[in-house]
Amino acid sequence: MNQPKAVILLSGGLDSATTAAIALASGYEAIALSLFYGQRHHKEIEAAQKIVQVLGIKEHYSLEVNLSQWGGSALTDQSIEVPKAGLNPHLIPITYVPGRNTVFIAIALSLAEAKGAQAIYLGINAIDYSGYPDCRPEYLEAFQKLANLSSKIGVEGKTIQLIAPLVKDSKVDIVRRAVRLGVPIADTWSCYQGEDEPCGLCDSCRIRDRALIEAGYPELATEIGRKLSH
Protein backbone atom coordinates (compact mmCIF):
# COMPACT_ATOMS: atom_id res chain seq x y z
CA MET A 1 0.00 0.00 0.00
CA ASN A 2 1.32 3.44 -0.93
CA GLN A 3 2.12 5.81 1.91
CA PRO A 4 -0.53 8.56 2.17
CA LYS A 5 0.60 12.11 1.44
CA ALA A 6 -0.14 15.32 3.27
CA VAL A 7 0.65 18.93 2.45
CA ILE A 8 1.94 20.79 5.51
CA LEU A 9 1.56 24.56 5.63
CA LEU A 10 4.92 25.32 7.23
CA SER A 11 5.41 28.94 8.24
CA GLY A 12 8.54 28.30 10.29
CA GLY A 13 6.82 28.96 13.60
CA LEU A 14 6.36 26.67 16.59
CA ASP A 15 2.80 25.65 15.76
CA SER A 16 3.42 24.72 12.14
CA ALA A 17 6.64 22.86 12.98
CA THR A 18 4.79 20.84 15.61
CA THR A 19 2.01 20.17 13.13
CA ALA A 20 4.55 18.87 10.61
CA ALA A 21 5.96 16.50 13.22
CA ILE A 22 2.45 15.27 14.04
CA ALA A 23 1.75 14.56 10.37
CA LEU A 24 4.97 12.57 10.07
CA ALA A 25 4.19 10.64 13.26
CA SER A 26 0.75 9.86 11.82
CA GLY A 27 2.37 8.06 8.90
CA TYR A 28 2.07 10.65 6.16
CA GLU A 29 4.66 11.45 3.53
CA ALA A 30 5.00 15.17 4.10
CA ILE A 31 5.04 17.82 1.39
CA ALA A 32 5.96 21.14 3.01
CA LEU A 33 4.64 24.44 1.67
CA SER A 34 6.02 27.79 2.86
CA LEU A 35 4.62 31.10 1.67
CA PHE A 36 6.27 34.50 1.81
CA TYR A 37 3.34 36.91 1.87
CA GLY A 38 5.23 40.20 2.07
CA GLN A 39 5.76 40.16 5.82
CA ARG A 40 8.46 42.27 7.42
CA HIS A 41 11.21 39.66 7.16
CA HIS A 42 12.29 36.28 5.76
CA LYS A 43 13.10 34.82 9.18
CA GLU A 44 10.13 32.47 9.06
CA ILE A 45 11.10 31.09 5.66
CA GLU A 46 14.66 30.54 6.85
CA ALA A 47 13.30 28.74 9.91
CA ALA A 48 11.07 26.56 7.72
CA GLN A 49 14.11 25.47 5.72
CA LYS A 50 15.87 24.38 8.92
CA ILE A 51 12.80 22.52 10.17
CA VAL A 52 12.44 20.62 6.91
CA GLN A 53 16.03 19.43 7.21
CA VAL A 54 15.75 18.39 10.86
CA LEU A 55 12.45 16.54 10.38
CA GLY A 56 13.65 14.88 7.19
CA ILE A 57 10.96 16.26 4.89
CA LYS A 58 12.19 15.69 1.34
CA GLU A 59 9.75 17.82 -0.65
CA HIS A 60 9.48 21.53 0.17
CA TYR A 61 7.89 24.27 -1.93
CA SER A 62 8.42 27.98 -1.24
CA LEU A 63 6.17 30.48 -2.99
CA GLU A 64 5.78 34.25 -2.86
CA VAL A 65 2.31 35.76 -2.62
CA ASN A 66 3.01 39.41 -1.96
CA LEU A 67 0.08 40.72 0.07
CA SER A 68 2.15 43.77 1.03
CA GLN A 69 1.17 45.39 -2.26
CA TRP A 70 -2.08 46.46 -0.63
CA GLY A 71 -1.08 46.21 3.05
CA GLY A 72 -3.89 46.39 5.57
CA SER A 73 -1.83 44.85 8.38
CA ALA A 74 1.10 45.78 10.57
CA LEU A 75 2.80 42.64 9.27
CA THR A 76 2.63 43.68 5.63
CA ASP A 77 2.71 47.49 5.85
CA GLN A 78 5.92 49.05 7.17
CA SER A 79 4.09 52.30 7.94
CA ILE A 80 1.99 50.56 10.61
CA GLU A 81 3.81 49.90 13.87
CA VAL A 82 3.68 46.37 15.26
CA PRO A 83 1.90 46.75 18.61
CA LYS A 84 3.22 45.43 21.88
CA ALA A 85 1.33 42.66 23.64
CA GLY A 86 -1.55 43.35 26.00
CA LEU A 87 -4.14 44.72 23.58
CA ASN A 88 -7.89 44.26 23.99
CA PRO A 89 -8.44 40.50 23.50
CA HIS A 90 -11.95 41.14 22.19
CA LEU A 91 -10.72 43.15 19.21
CA ILE A 92 -9.09 41.80 16.06
CA PRO A 93 -5.56 43.26 16.18
CA ILE A 94 -3.82 45.21 13.43
CA THR A 95 -1.46 42.23 12.99
CA TYR A 96 -4.31 40.34 11.34
CA VAL A 97 -3.50 39.95 7.63
CA PRO A 98 -6.70 40.17 5.54
CA GLY A 99 -7.51 36.83 3.94
CA ARG A 100 -4.10 35.31 4.66
CA ASN A 101 -5.21 31.85 5.75
CA THR A 102 -7.83 31.71 3.01
CA VAL A 103 -5.14 32.41 0.40
CA PHE A 104 -2.73 29.95 2.02
CA ILE A 105 -5.18 27.07 2.27
CA ALA A 106 -6.36 27.62 -1.30
CA ILE A 107 -2.77 27.28 -2.54
CA ALA A 108 -2.24 24.23 -0.32
CA LEU A 109 -5.41 22.70 -1.79
CA SER A 110 -4.06 23.20 -5.31
CA LEU A 111 -0.77 21.55 -4.36
CA ALA A 112 -2.50 18.70 -2.54
CA GLU A 113 -4.76 17.89 -5.46
CA ALA A 114 -1.89 18.07 -7.95
CA LYS A 115 0.23 15.74 -5.81
CA GLY A 116 -2.54 13.30 -4.95
CA ALA A 117 -2.38 14.15 -1.25
CA GLN A 118 -5.14 13.02 1.06
CA ALA A 119 -4.76 15.75 3.68
CA ILE A 120 -3.64 19.29 4.41
CA TYR A 121 -2.15 19.87 7.85
CA LEU A 122 -2.55 23.33 9.37
CA GLY A 123 -0.98 24.83 12.49
CA ILE A 124 -4.07 26.90 13.26
CA ASN A 125 -4.83 27.39 16.95
CA ALA A 126 -7.96 28.89 18.50
CA ILE A 127 -6.98 28.92 22.18
CA ASP A 128 -3.77 30.87 22.80
CA TYR A 129 -3.82 33.06 19.71
CA SER A 130 -4.26 36.71 18.79
CA GLY A 131 -7.98 36.70 17.97
CA TYR A 132 -7.75 36.16 14.22
CA PRO A 133 -11.08 35.13 12.62
CA ASP A 134 -9.41 32.62 10.29
CA CYS A 135 -8.07 30.55 13.20
CA ARG A 136 -11.46 29.36 14.44
CA PRO A 137 -12.88 25.81 14.13
CA GLU A 138 -15.96 27.13 12.31
CA TYR A 139 -13.70 28.72 9.71
CA LEU A 140 -12.03 25.36 9.06
CA GLU A 141 -15.40 23.62 8.82
CA ALA A 142 -16.55 26.14 6.22
CA PHE A 143 -13.33 25.80 4.21
CA GLN A 144 -13.64 22.02 4.26
CA LYS A 145 -17.01 22.37 2.53
CA LEU A 146 -15.45 24.74 0.00
CA ALA A 147 -12.60 22.28 -0.64
CA ASN A 148 -15.06 19.48 -1.26
CA LEU A 149 -17.10 21.60 -3.69
CA SER A 150 -14.23 23.25 -5.55
CA SER A 151 -11.93 20.31 -6.29
CA LYS A 152 -12.06 17.55 -8.88
CA ILE A 153 -11.47 14.96 -6.19
CA GLY A 154 -14.38 16.40 -4.20
CA VAL A 155 -16.76 16.18 -7.14
CA GLU A 156 -15.68 12.55 -7.57
CA GLY A 157 -16.85 11.81 -4.03
CA LYS A 158 -13.51 11.82 -2.24
CA THR A 159 -11.99 14.50 -0.06
CA ILE A 160 -8.77 16.26 0.85
CA GLN A 161 -9.12 16.51 4.60
CA LEU A 162 -8.15 19.70 6.41
CA ILE A 163 -6.48 18.64 9.65
CA ALA A 164 -5.65 21.15 12.40
CA PRO A 165 -4.35 18.98 15.25
CA LEU A 166 -3.54 21.95 17.49
CA VAL A 167 -6.72 23.94 17.03
CA LYS A 168 -7.98 23.32 20.58
CA ASP A 169 -4.60 22.99 22.32
CA SER A 170 -3.20 25.62 24.64
CA LYS A 171 0.21 26.97 23.74
CA VAL A 172 1.65 25.10 26.74
CA ASP A 173 0.21 21.87 25.36
CA ILE A 174 1.78 22.66 21.99
CA VAL A 175 5.21 23.18 23.56
CA ARG A 176 4.97 19.85 25.35
CA ARG A 177 3.90 18.05 22.18
CA ALA A 178 6.76 19.68 20.30
CA VAL A 179 9.27 18.43 22.85
CA ARG A 180 7.86 14.89 22.76
CA LEU A 181 8.03 14.83 18.96
CA GLY A 182 11.58 16.17 18.74
CA VAL A 183 10.67 19.49 17.14
CA PRO A 184 13.69 21.84 17.01
CA ILE A 185 11.98 24.60 18.98
CA ALA A 186 15.10 26.79 19.02
CA ASP A 187 15.08 26.81 15.21
CA THR A 188 11.48 28.03 14.93
CA TRP A 189 10.60 31.72 14.57
CA SER A 190 7.45 33.34 15.93
CA CYS A 191 8.39 37.01 16.32
CA TYR A 192 6.60 39.58 14.18
CA GLN A 193 9.81 41.59 13.91
CA GLY A 194 12.80 40.65 11.76
CA GLU A 195 15.71 41.48 14.05
CA ASP A 196 18.61 39.15 14.80
CA GLU A 197 16.80 37.99 17.95
CA PRO A 198 13.07 37.82 18.76
CA CYS A 199 11.82 41.07 20.29
CA GLY A 200 10.10 39.44 23.27
CA LEU A 201 7.44 42.16 23.30
CA CYS A 202 5.07 41.53 20.39
CA ASP A 203 1.93 39.48 20.98
CA SER A 204 3.39 36.43 19.28
CA CYS A 205 6.57 36.52 21.38
CA ARG A 206 4.66 37.01 24.63
CA ILE A 207 2.32 34.08 23.98
CA ARG A 208 5.25 31.86 23.04
CA ASP A 209 7.46 32.94 25.96
CA ARG A 210 4.72 32.44 28.55
CA ALA A 211 4.07 28.94 27.23
CA LEU A 212 7.75 27.97 27.17
CA ILE A 213 8.24 29.16 30.73
CA GLU A 214 5.06 27.50 32.02
CA ALA A 215 5.95 24.24 30.27
CA GLY A 216 9.33 24.23 32.01
CA TYR A 217 11.62 25.43 29.23
CA PRO A 218 12.54 29.01 30.21
CA GLU A 219 15.91 28.68 28.48
CA LEU A 220 14.06 28.68 25.14
CA ALA A 221 12.22 31.92 25.94
CA THR A 222 13.59 35.38 25.19
CA GLU A 223 15.52 37.22 27.88
CA ILE A 224 12.79 39.85 27.97
CA GLY A 225 10.17 37.14 28.32
CA ARG A 226 11.98 35.62 31.29
CA LYS A 227 12.23 39.02 33.00
CA LEU A 228 8.56 39.79 32.41
CA SER A 229 7.54 36.45 33.90
CA HIS A 230 8.88 37.41 37.35
UniProtKB/Swiss-Prot annotation:
It catalyses: 7-carboxy-7-deazaguanine + NH4(+) + ATP = 7-cyano-7-deazaguanine + ADP + phosphate + H2O + H(+). ATP binds at residues 10-20. Pfam families: QueC. It comes from the Bacteria. Zn(2+) binds at residues 191, 199, 202, 205. InterPro entries: QueC, Rossmann-like_a/b/a_fold. GO terms for molecular function: ATP binding; ligase activity, forming carbon-nitrogen bonds; zinc ion binding. Gene3D superfamilies: HUPs (3.40.50.620). Keywords: ATP-binding, Ligase, Metal-binding, Nucleotide-binding, Queuosine biosynthesis, Zinc. It is an enzyme of class 6 (ligase). Its cofactor is Zn(2+). Coiled coil: none annotated. The keyword Zinc-finger does not apply. Binds 1 zinc ion per subunit. GO terms for biological process: queuosine biosynthetic process. Catalyzes the ATP-dependent conversion of 7-carboxy-7-deazaguanine (CDG) to 7-cyano-7-deazaguanine (preQ(0)). Belongs to the QueC family. This is 7-cyano-7-deazaguanine synthase.
